[in-house]
Protein backbone atom coordinates (compact mmCIF):
# COMPACT_ATOMS: atom_id res chain seq x y z
CA UNK A 1 0.00 0.00 0.00
CA UNK A 2 1.16 3.55 -0.66
CA UNK A 3 4.65 4.39 -1.90
CA UNK A 4 6.20 0.93 -1.32
CA UNK A 5 3.43 -0.69 -3.37
CA UNK A 6 3.82 1.85 -6.17
CA UNK A 7 7.58 1.34 -6.22
CA UNK A 8 7.16 -2.43 -6.60
CA UNK A 9 4.54 -1.95 -9.32
CA UNK A 10 6.82 0.40 -11.24
CA UNK A 11 9.75 -2.00 -10.96
CA UNK A 12 7.64 -4.89 -12.25
CA UNK A 13 6.56 -2.72 -15.19
CA UNK A 14 10.14 -1.80 -16.05
CA UNK A 15 10.26 1.69 -14.56
CA UNK A 16 12.44 3.15 -11.82
CA UNK A 17 10.29 4.99 -9.29
CA UNK A 18 11.43 7.91 -7.17
CA UNK A 19 9.12 9.21 -4.48
CA UNK A 20 8.24 12.13 -2.26
CA UNK A 21 6.39 11.61 1.02
CA UNK A 22 3.31 13.71 1.70
CA UNK A 23 2.39 11.95 4.93
CA UNK A 24 3.23 8.98 7.14
CA UNK A 25 0.37 6.64 8.00
CA UNK A 26 -0.27 4.22 10.84
CA UNK A 27 -2.14 1.62 8.81
CA UNK A 28 -2.91 -2.04 8.38
CA UNK A 29 -5.11 -3.93 5.92
CA UNK A 30 -8.20 -3.04 7.96
CA UNK A 31 -7.76 0.73 7.79
CA UNK A 32 -5.84 3.86 8.67
CA UNK A 33 -5.46 4.83 12.34
CA UNK A 34 -3.37 7.98 12.15
CA UNK A 35 -1.86 10.34 9.58
CA UNK A 36 1.07 12.65 10.16
CA UNK A 37 1.35 15.19 7.34
CA UNK A 38 4.84 15.96 6.04
CA UNK A 39 5.76 19.63 6.21
CA UNK A 40 5.45 21.41 2.85
CA UNK A 41 9.06 22.61 3.17
CA UNK A 42 10.37 19.06 3.42
CA UNK A 43 8.14 17.94 0.58
CA UNK A 44 9.40 20.78 -1.62
CA UNK A 45 13.06 20.07 -0.78
CA UNK A 46 12.75 16.36 -1.56
CA UNK A 47 10.87 16.86 -4.82
CA UNK A 48 13.23 19.48 -6.18
CA UNK A 49 16.28 17.51 -5.07
CA UNK A 50 15.13 14.54 -7.13
CA UNK A 51 13.92 16.56 -10.12
CA UNK A 52 17.24 18.39 -10.34
CA UNK A 53 19.23 15.17 -10.00
CA UNK A 54 17.74 12.92 -12.68
CA UNK A 55 15.36 13.01 -15.66
CA UNK A 56 11.75 12.27 -14.74
CA UNK A 57 9.46 11.05 -17.51
CA UNK A 58 6.08 11.21 -15.72
CA UNK A 59 4.63 12.05 -12.31
CA UNK A 60 1.76 10.62 -10.30
CA UNK A 61 0.19 12.60 -7.45
CA UNK A 62 -1.49 10.76 -4.61
CA UNK A 63 -3.03 12.05 -1.38
CA UNK A 64 -2.15 15.47 0.01
CA UNK A 65 -3.11 16.46 3.53
CA UNK A 66 -2.65 20.23 3.78
CA UNK A 67 -3.49 23.15 1.53
CA UNK A 68 0.12 24.31 1.90
CA UNK A 69 1.31 21.02 0.42
CA UNK A 70 -1.08 21.46 -2.49
CA UNK A 71 0.35 24.94 -3.08
CA UNK A 72 3.89 23.54 -3.06
CA UNK A 73 2.89 20.84 -5.53
CA UNK A 74 1.34 23.44 -7.82
CA UNK A 75 4.58 25.42 -7.85
CA UNK A 76 6.65 22.32 -8.59
CA UNK A 77 4.42 21.10 -11.41
CA UNK A 78 4.38 24.60 -12.91
CA UNK A 79 8.19 24.60 -12.94
CA UNK A 80 8.21 21.15 -14.60
CA UNK A 81 5.19 21.55 -16.85
CA UNK A 82 6.75 19.42 -19.60
CA UNK A 83 6.46 16.28 -17.45
CA UNK A 84 3.18 14.35 -17.89
CA UNK A 85 1.14 14.52 -14.69
CA UNK A 86 -1.46 12.06 -13.38
CA UNK A 87 -3.54 13.10 -10.36
CA UNK A 88 -5.23 10.31 -8.42
CA UNK A 89 -8.15 11.96 -6.65
CA UNK A 90 -8.95 10.19 -3.38
CA UNK A 91 -11.15 10.50 -0.35
CA UNK A 92 -9.38 11.88 2.71
CA UNK A 93 -9.80 9.44 5.62
CA UNK A 94 -12.12 10.57 8.41
CA UNK A 95 -9.30 11.18 10.86
CA UNK A 96 -8.30 14.24 12.91
CA UNK A 97 -5.32 15.56 10.97
CA UNK A 98 -5.27 19.07 12.41
CA UNK A 99 -7.81 21.25 14.16
CA UNK A 100 -7.54 23.85 11.41
CA UNK A 101 -7.56 21.43 8.47
CA UNK A 102 -10.63 20.89 6.34
CA UNK A 103 -10.39 17.99 3.89
CA UNK A 104 -12.72 19.81 1.50
CA UNK A 105 -10.30 22.76 1.51
CA UNK A 106 -7.51 20.43 0.40
CA UNK A 107 -9.61 19.01 -2.41
CA UNK A 108 -10.73 22.46 -3.54
CA UNK A 109 -7.11 23.66 -3.56
CA UNK A 110 -6.13 20.61 -5.59
CA UNK A 111 -8.91 21.31 -8.08
CA UNK A 112 -8.03 24.99 -8.42
CA UNK A 113 -4.22 24.85 -8.34
CA UNK A 114 -3.16 21.49 -9.76
CA UNK A 115 -5.78 20.12 -12.15
CA UNK A 116 -5.04 22.79 -14.74
CA UNK A 117 -1.53 21.35 -15.02
CA UNK A 118 -2.58 17.69 -15.14
CA UNK A 119 -2.79 15.46 -18.18
CA UNK A 120 -5.17 13.06 -16.44
CA UNK A 121 -7.21 12.82 -13.25
CA UNK A 122 -8.26 9.36 -12.02
CA UNK A 123 -11.27 9.19 -9.71
CA UNK A 124 -13.89 6.68 -8.60
CA UNK A 125 -17.54 7.22 -9.45
CA UNK A 126 -18.61 6.71 -5.83
CA UNK A 127 -16.27 9.47 -4.69
CA UNK A 128 -17.67 11.86 -7.29
CA UNK A 129 -21.15 11.14 -5.95
CA UNK A 130 -19.98 11.85 -2.40
CA UNK A 131 -18.41 15.14 -3.44
CA UNK A 132 -21.60 16.13 -5.22
CA UNK A 133 -23.74 15.30 -2.17
CA UNK A 134 -21.41 17.42 0.00
CA UNK A 135 -21.49 20.33 -2.46
CA UNK A 136 -17.81 20.08 -3.39
CA UNK A 137 -18.86 19.44 -7.00
CA UNK A 138 -22.13 20.65 -8.55
CA UNK A 139 -25.18 18.67 -9.60
CA UNK A 140 -26.02 15.04 -9.04
CA UNK A 141 -25.23 13.45 -12.42
CA UNK A 142 -21.91 12.05 -13.60
CA UNK A 143 -21.74 14.32 -16.66
CA UNK A 144 -22.08 17.39 -14.43
CA UNK A 145 -19.23 16.26 -12.19
CA UNK A 146 -17.03 15.50 -15.20
CA UNK A 147 -17.73 18.90 -16.73
CA UNK A 148 -16.86 20.57 -13.43
CA UNK A 149 -13.50 18.80 -13.19
CA UNK A 150 -12.70 19.52 -16.84
CA UNK A 151 -13.57 23.17 -16.28
CA UNK A 152 -10.67 23.33 -13.82
CA UNK A 153 -8.38 22.71 -16.80
CA UNK A 154 -7.40 19.05 -16.59
CA UNK A 155 -6.87 17.52 -20.02
CA UNK A 156 -8.86 14.34 -19.30
CA UNK A 157 -10.68 12.52 -16.50
CA UNK A 158 -10.87 8.75 -16.04
CA UNK A 159 -13.80 7.62 -13.90
CA UNK A 160 -13.68 4.08 -12.55
CA UNK A 161 -16.85 2.23 -11.63
CA UNK A 162 -18.95 4.43 -13.91
CA UNK A 163 -22.43 3.07 -14.74
CA UNK A 164 -22.81 1.62 -18.21
CA UNK A 165 -25.58 -0.23 -20.00
CA UNK A 166 -27.84 -2.11 -17.62
CA UNK A 167 -25.95 -3.04 -14.46
CA UNK A 168 -22.58 -2.96 -16.19
CA UNK A 169 -19.76 -0.98 -14.59
CA UNK A 170 -17.24 0.70 -16.85
CA UNK A 171 -14.19 2.93 -16.89
CA UNK A 172 -15.08 6.19 -18.63
CA UNK A 173 -12.48 8.53 -20.13
CA UNK A 174 -13.62 12.04 -21.01
CA UNK A 175 -11.25 14.65 -22.45
CA UNK A 176 -11.30 18.43 -22.63
CA UNK A 177 -12.91 18.31 -26.09
CA UNK A 178 -15.85 16.24 -24.85
CA UNK A 179 -14.63 13.04 -26.50
CA UNK A 180 -15.44 9.91 -24.48
CA UNK A 181 -14.23 6.35 -24.48
CA UNK A 182 -15.38 3.43 -22.33
CA UNK A 183 -13.83 0.16 -21.24
CA UNK A 184 -15.29 -2.65 -19.13
CA UNK A 185 -14.48 -2.25 -15.45
CA UNK A 186 -11.43 -4.13 -14.21
CA UNK A 187 -13.60 -6.45 -12.14
CA UNK A 188 -12.45 -9.03 -9.64
CA UNK A 189 -12.70 -8.96 -5.86
CA UNK A 190 -12.48 -5.60 -4.06
CA UNK A 191 -8.84 -4.72 -3.42
CA UNK A 192 -7.23 -1.94 -1.41
CA UNK A 193 -6.08 0.96 -3.61
CA UNK A 194 -7.12 -0.62 -6.91
CA UNK A 195 -7.39 2.82 -8.52
CA UNK A 196 -3.95 3.68 -7.18
CA UNK A 197 -2.43 0.72 -9.00
CA UNK A 198 -4.30 1.70 -12.17
CA UNK A 199 -3.05 5.30 -11.93
CA UNK A 200 0.50 4.03 -11.43
CA UNK A 201 0.27 1.72 -14.44
CA UNK A 202 -1.05 4.57 -16.59
CA UNK A 203 1.80 6.80 -15.40
CA UNK A 204 4.39 4.22 -16.46
CA UNK A 205 2.86 4.17 -19.94
CA UNK A 206 2.93 7.98 -20.15
CA UNK A 207 6.58 7.81 -19.11
CA UNK A 208 7.20 5.66 -22.18
CA UNK A 209 5.66 8.33 -24.40
CA UNK A 210 2.13 6.99 -24.88
CA UNK A 211 -0.75 9.40 -25.39
CA UNK A 212 -3.39 9.45 -22.66
CA UNK A 213 -6.01 7.17 -24.35
CA UNK A 214 -3.38 4.56 -25.19
CA UNK A 215 -1.84 4.83 -21.72
CA UNK A 216 -5.26 4.28 -20.14
CA UNK A 217 -5.95 1.30 -22.41
CA UNK A 218 -2.64 -0.35 -21.54
CA UNK A 219 -2.96 0.58 -17.88
CA UNK A 220 -6.34 -1.12 -17.68
CA UNK A 221 -4.83 -4.24 -19.23
CA UNK A 222 -2.16 -4.25 -16.53
CA UNK A 223 -4.77 -3.72 -13.81
CA UNK A 224 -6.85 -6.63 -15.11
CA UNK A 225 -3.82 -8.91 -14.99
CA UNK A 226 -3.02 -7.77 -11.45
CA UNK A 227 -6.65 -8.34 -10.40
CA UNK A 228 -5.97 -12.05 -10.83
CA UNK A 229 -3.18 -11.83 -8.25
CA UNK A 230 -4.73 -10.83 -4.94
CA UNK A 231 -4.55 -12.27 -1.45
CA UNK A 232 -5.67 -11.49 2.09
CA UNK A 233 -2.57 -11.38 4.31
CA UNK A 234 -4.29 -10.10 7.45
CA UNK A 235 -7.68 -9.55 9.04
CA UNK A 236 -8.65 -6.67 6.75
CA UNK A 237 -8.99 -6.16 3.02
CA UNK A 238 -7.41 -7.99 0.13
CA UNK A 239 -4.31 -6.50 -1.46
CA UNK A 240 -2.49 -7.11 -4.72
CA UNK A 241 0.14 -9.85 -4.66
CA UNK A 242 3.04 -8.02 -6.23
CA UNK A 243 5.57 -10.81 -5.66
CA UNK A 244 6.72 -12.88 -8.61
CA UNK A 245 6.63 -16.18 -6.73
Which role does the model predict for each range below?
Residues 1-11, 190-197:
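Glycine/serine-rich anion-binding loops at beta->alpha junctions
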Residues 3-101, 243-244:
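Conserved N-terminal subdomain of the carbohydrate kinase-like
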Residues 14, 18, 181, 205-219:
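Phosphate-handling active-site elements
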Residues 100-179:
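Conserved phosphate/ATP/ADP-binding segment of small-molecule kinases
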Residues 130, 189-212, 216:
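Short, small-residue alpha-helix embedded
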Residues 178-187:
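A short, charged helix-loop
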Residues 213-245:
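Charged C-terminal helix
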Amino acid sequence: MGLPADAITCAELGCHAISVLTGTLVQDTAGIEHIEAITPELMDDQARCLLEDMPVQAMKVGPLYTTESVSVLAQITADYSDIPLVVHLQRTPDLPLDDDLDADDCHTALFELVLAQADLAVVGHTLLQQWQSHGLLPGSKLDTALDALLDYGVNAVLVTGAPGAGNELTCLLRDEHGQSRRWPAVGGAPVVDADGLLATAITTELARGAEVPDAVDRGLGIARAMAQRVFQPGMGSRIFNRSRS
